[in-house]
């Protein structure tokens, strides 16, 4: 990946990493899936509806980039629904796509301490929709939290007052500046934006990153990425019933059971690849690249994005990883599916390390976008253009982390260093796939193409 530049942090990212990994399923759903490696010799390949090529997937429903207009940040697709009540969402508030009503309700509940005053007459099991949200405040607040709204994102009255004062001071400085209104020179990433998460004060850092604000363009970018991920995840949920069931028979070592496990993980990998491609097409700037570069970037980054999403689904209490809605796997399950211990252990170690960082949806989305736009990937025709497209995401992540964790100056470089770790894992993945080839295992055409598995 090319080395992104910032004005304050000089953290080297991976240089010319290993050549594009060969293949091996890495599946995902809500995130990616694992990747079978040293699989059982007698397990046949799984060829099916997954025979689409990368080019075909890129061509499918390809949408031109939307023109951006000045003014309030528009919704990315126009049909997002509130994750609390199902009404039309107005934006990304307090870490969740939600409507204005639920945004205001959550803010008032936190500021006024509503959690202790609300009571449900139905035993706390009300199904929340646009009608019931007015009937049961307790269940509405519960649904807000279940959807992911965070109390720490809500600004207190005192914080709002200080924020208004700072904004007024900035406006006065801009008006008195000889260069006129513009971006403050005190911070390379500052600008007339809002704290992470929305202009309503729904930012992760409660606006405490002194001197740093997200620009309006950065705020819109983050909203677009998070909304795109949510939409792609939901699409993949619909494929869950089509996946070959995990064998639960009496003899887990039978040939049929091994075949089913291999097919199961391979099909999850295909869902993951399709989801990643769908997401990449919605990342601002990706479709501006030539077709050759789009394919080169996807081939090289897919396994790394799968591993990022795998870490995102890691549960430290159960030490399991969940894909799609409710497919949960332990280390033993990964091994039974055909992966080698040499690949399984690093996956779980990486997942634990990512959990310690505590990334939110916006940070994961930005990190994935940075990973996609890696100019040093093999066969990239216009590396300078790719690097230029990557830089705004690096700048946005830097500003976002400064606002969210202003006291943790090492958070941003730690996140970038995880991309270096992904290059190492990608190399281990290549060895995993080589084991498959030695055993004459054939992957479905899509996985063979995305990871350059040559017969």
From Swiss-Prot:
Record carries keyword Kinase: no
Coiled coil (UniProt feature): none
ZnF (NR C4-type) intervals: 82-102, 120-144
Keyword terms: Activator, DNA-binding, Isopeptide bond, Metal-binding, Nucleus, Receptor, Transcription, Transcription regulation, Ubl conjugation, Zinc, Zinc-finger
Biased composition (Polar residues): 1-10
GO biological process terms on file: cell differentiation; cholesterol homeostasis; intracellular receptor signaling pathway; negative regulation of inflammatory response; negative regulation of response to endoplasmic reticulum stress; negative regulation of transcription by RNA polymerase II; phosphatidylcholine acyl-chain remodeling; positive regulation of cholesterol efflux
Presence of the UniProt keyword DNA-binding in the record: yes
PROSITE patterns, alphabetized: NR_LBD, NUCLEAR_REC_DBD_1, NUCLEAR_REC_DBD_2
Residue ranges, annotated region (Disordered): 1-53, 164-210
Bias (Low complexity): 14-26, 168-193
DNA-binding region per UniProt: 79-156
Positions of the UniProt region annotated as Transactivation AF-2: 214-455
Start and end residues of each NR LBD domain: 217-455
Compartments in which it is found: Nucleus
Main localization category: nucleus
Source domain of life: Eukaryota
Function noted in UniProt: Nuclear receptor that exhibits a ligand-dependent transcriptional activation activity. Binds preferentially to double-stranded oligonucleotide direct repeats having the consensus half-site sequence 5'-AGGTCA-3' and 4-nt spacing (DR-4). Regulates cholesterol uptake through MYLIP-dependent ubiquitination of LDLR, VLDLR and LRP8; DLDLR and LRP8. Interplays functionally with RORA for the regulation of genes involved in liver metabolism. Induces LPCAT3-dependent phospholipid remodeling in endoplasmic reticulum (ER) membranes of hepatocytes, driving SREBF1 processing and lipogenesis.
Assembly information from the UniProt record: Forms a heterodimer with RXR. Interacts with CCAR2 (via N-terminus) in a ligand-independent manner. Interacts (when sumoylated) with GPS2; interaction with GPS2 onto hepatic acute phase protein promoters prevents N-Cor corepressor complex dissociation. Interacts with ABCA12 and ABCA1; this interaction is required for ABCA1 localization to the cell surface and is necessary for its normal activity and stability.
Protein name as it appears in the record: Oxysterols receptor LXR-beta
Phylogenetic lineage: Eukaryota, Metazoa, Chordata, Craniata, Vertebrata
């Amino acid at each position: 990946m090319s080395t992104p530049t910032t004005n304050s942090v000089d953290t080297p990212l991976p240089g010319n990493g290993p050549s594009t990994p060969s293949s091996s399923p890495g599946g995902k759903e809500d995130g990616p899936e694992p990747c079978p490696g040293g699989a059982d010799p007698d397990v046949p390949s799984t060829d099916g509806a997954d025979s689409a090529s990368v080019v075909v997937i890129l061509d499918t429903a390809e949408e031109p980039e939307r023109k951006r207009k000045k003014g309030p940040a528009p919704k990315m697709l126009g049909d997002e629904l509130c994750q609390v009540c199902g009404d039309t969402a107005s934006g990304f508030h307090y870490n969740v796509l939600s409507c204005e009503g639920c945004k205001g309700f959550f803010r008032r509940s936190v500021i006024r301490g509503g959690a202790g005053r609300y009571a449900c007459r139905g035993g706390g099991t009300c199904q929340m929709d646009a009608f019931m949200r007015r009937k049961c405040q307790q269940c509405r607040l519960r649904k807000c939290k279940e959807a992911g709204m965070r109390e720490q994102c809500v600004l207190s009255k005192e914080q709002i007052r200080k924020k208004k004062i700072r904004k007024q001071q900035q406006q006065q400085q801009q008006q008195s500046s000889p260069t006129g209104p513009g971006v403050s020179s005190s911070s390379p990433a500052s600008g007339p934006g809002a704290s992470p998460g929305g202009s309503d004060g729904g930012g992760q850092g409660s606006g405490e990153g002194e001197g740093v604000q997200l620009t309006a363009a950065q705020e819109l970018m983050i909203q677009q990425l998070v909304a795109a991920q949510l939409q792609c995840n939901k699409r993949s949920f619909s494929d869950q019933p089509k996946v070959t069931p995990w064998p639960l028979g009496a003899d887990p070592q039978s040939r049929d059971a091994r075949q089913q496990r291999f097919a199961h993980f391979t099909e999850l990998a295909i869902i993951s690849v399709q989801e990643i491609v769908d997401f990449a097409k919605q990342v601002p700037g990706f479709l501006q690249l030539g077709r050759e570069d789009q394919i080169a970037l996807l081939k090289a980054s897919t396994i790394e994005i799968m591993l990022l999403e795998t870490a995102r689904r890691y549960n430290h209490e159960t030490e399991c990883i969940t894909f799609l809605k409710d497919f949960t796997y332990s280390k033993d399950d990964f091994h039974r599916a055909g992966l080698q211990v040499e690949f399984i252990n690093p996956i779980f170690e990486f997942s634990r390390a990512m959990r310690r960082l505590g990334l939110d949806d916006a940070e994961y989305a930005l990190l994935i976008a940075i990973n996609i736009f890696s100019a040093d990937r093999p066969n990239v025709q216009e590396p300078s253009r790719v690097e230029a497209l990557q830089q705004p995401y690096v700048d946005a992540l830097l500003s976002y982390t400064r606002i969210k964790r202003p006291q943790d100056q090492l958070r941003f470089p730690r996140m970038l260093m995880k991309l270096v770790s992904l290059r190492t894992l990608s190399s281990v993945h290549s060895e995993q796939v080589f084991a498959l080839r030695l055993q004459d295992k054939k992957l479905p055409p899509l996985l063979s193409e995305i990871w350059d598995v040559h017969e």
